[in-house]
Each structure stands twice: as C-alpha cells, then as structure tokens.
C-alpha cells in the first residue's frame, strides 16, 4: 500500500505472456542409470593404455554428468519446465624428459581435456577413450623430441574445430568483455593492462 502512494503513472510491462512448454535434452542412454563399474572400467582401461607408453609419467581420465531441472511459473499463467542433461569425458597424458626437464601434455578429445555436451551416455561411448588413449600418450612423448615451430612473422596454420573454437573464444570473446575494454579486468593471471 505504501508504494502505491508514490506511483506517478501506470507502468506498461508488455503483453501478457502465457507460454506453456516442456523441454528435455534428447538422450538415448541416461548417464545416471549406467553402472558405476562400467564408467570406472572405461576410465581404467584408458588409464592402462596410456601408462603402457614409455615416458608417460602422469595420466588423467574423467567423466562428468549433470542433470538440471528447472521450472518457471509466473503469475500470468506461464509454465515452462526443462530438464537438461550434460555428459562429458576426457583423458590426458603427461610425458617428461628428466634430462632436459621438459614436460609435454596431450589430451583428448579437446585441448583442455574434457568435452561436455547436452547428450546422454551415448556421447561417452562415441568418444572411444580407450581406443584413443595410446595415441594420446605417444603424442605426448613425441612432443618431447619434436622440433620447435619456426618463428616467422606470418605463416599458415591449420586448426581443427575444437582448437579453432578456443582461438576464437580467446581472440574475440575475451577482448569484447567490457572489463577488458575498460582495462579493469583482473584475474589470477594478472590484469589486462
């Protein structure tokens, strides 16, 4: 009642929205009903394959699953329900050369390791972690003796999809964030300017 005394004019907040809907992530295999033994077994198999490669000192494997249920209900008769399921996985191998102190890491399926998508456990099996584990480990070891990239002012390079997405994110996404534009960004890595 008190706030009504301060009203100068009616406020138009737009047309009444009466949306009704339900959405669920398309999932073929619910990751939450897959046995823990199956998930752990897959990670252990990938772990074993990576550890077979001489020169690999540390390996990592991970899976993550998210189920998020949301419901929006308004006083204007809107009712929207959604269930989002995410599934993700990844492996990484670290190789070291004790004589030079060089350390190299390769990961799969992304440069940062895990790839997470809105799908079910079928995504995990499609990644073929165990089948790619030895290759990932061998690439980590190969990087220890690989020649350094030449440093030219300009050169053509080929990036696959996930690395290109990361480059666009870092080169275009971060620079247009307002805190960076204004020079006020600060993080663990320091400040922009």
Regions flagged by a language model, labelled:
Residues 1-193:
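Active-site bordering "gate/hinge" segments
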């Amino acid at each position: 009642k008190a706030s009504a005394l301060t009203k100068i004019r009616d406020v138009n907040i737009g047309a009444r929205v009466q949306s009704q809907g339900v959405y669920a992530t398309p999932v073929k295999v619910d990751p939450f009903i897959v046995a823990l033994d199956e998930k752990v077994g897959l990670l252990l198999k990938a772990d074993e394959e990576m550890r077979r490669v001489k020169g690999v000192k540390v390996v990592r494997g991970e899976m993550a699953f998210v189920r998020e249920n949301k419901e929006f209900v308004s006083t204007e008769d809107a009712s929207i329900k959604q269930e989002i399921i995410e599934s993700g996985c990844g492996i990484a191998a670290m190789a070291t050369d004790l004589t030079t102190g060089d350390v190299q890491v390769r990961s799969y399926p992304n440069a940062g390791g895990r790839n997470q998508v809105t799908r079910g456990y079928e995504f995990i099996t499609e990644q073929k972690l165990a089948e790619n584990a030895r290759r990932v480990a061998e690439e980590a070891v190969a990087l220890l003796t690989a020649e350094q990239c030449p440093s030219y002012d300009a050169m053509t390079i080929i990036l696959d999809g996930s690395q290109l997405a990361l480059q666009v994110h870092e080169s275009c996404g971060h620079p247009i964030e307002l805190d960076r534009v204004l020079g006020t960004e600060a993080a663990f890595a320091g400040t922009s300017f």
